[in-house]
């Protein structure tokens, strides 16, 4: 199992304090996954907390500037993953307590790329992060979907 997580990383290239996060964004790490059996994407929380721009729905012809916005970056992420791993099951884990704009964007973009969304609920948290109990609940909710 490979867990490829960076603390504070965003899907898009915009990070906290409007810093350039292209060195750690999800969209710039897709080539590092190797040959996975399954891909679980748990993102959007830091994009929301960093107040990254939402951007427009855009499904191709991305320019560098577009990827500093959440929607085009998520579309590029899923497009790249589908191209690199056409036979791998991909799931998006949608955290609870995000802005409706993020939730709706994730659902719409994931639908375009046929990526199931696992919407988390009732996750016990402390300072916005899952507690041990919350992580167990998260695991249970994800396993319930991927074991089908």
Which functions belong to the PLM regions below?
Residues 1-59, 63, 129:
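Conserved SGNH/GDSL esterase-like catalytic core that processes O-acyl groups on lipids
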Residues 126-148:
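Histidine-centered active-site loop/cap adjacent to the catalytic His
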Residues 1-2, 34-39, 85-90, 113-116:
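Loop/turn elements at helix/coil->beta-strand transitions in domains of secreted/extracellular proteins
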Residues 60-69, 122-130:
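The substrate-binding groove and active-site-proximal loops of carbohydrate-active enzymes
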Residues 42-52, 74-107:
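Active-site segments of SGNH/GDSL-like serine hydrolases
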Residues 70, 74, 135:
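Aromatic/hydrophobic pocket-lining residues that form the small-molecule binding cavity
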Residues 3-5, 94, 119-121:
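Residue-level recognition of beta-strand->loop/alpha-helix junctions
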Residues 25-28, 99-116:
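Short, electropositive alpha-helical surface patch
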């Amino acid at each position: 199992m490979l867990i490829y997580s960076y603390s504070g990383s965003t899907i898009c290239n915009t990070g906290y304090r409007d810093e350039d996060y292209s060195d750690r964004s999800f969209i710039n790490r897709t080539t590092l996954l190797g040959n996975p059996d399954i891909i679980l994407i748990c993102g959007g929380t830091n994009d929301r907390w960093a107040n990254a721009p939402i951007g427009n729905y855009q499904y191709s012809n991305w320019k560098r500037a577009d990827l500093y916005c959440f929607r085009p970056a998520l579309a590029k992420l899923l497009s790249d993953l589908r191209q690199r791993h056409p036979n791998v099951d991909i799931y998006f884990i949608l955290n609870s307590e995000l802005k409706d704009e993020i939730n709706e964007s994730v659902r719409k973009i994931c639908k375009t790329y046929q990526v199931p969304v696992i919407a988390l609920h009732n996750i016990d948290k402390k300072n916005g992060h899952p507690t041990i109990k919350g992580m167990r609940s998260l695991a249970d909710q994800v396993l319930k979907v991927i074991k089908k």
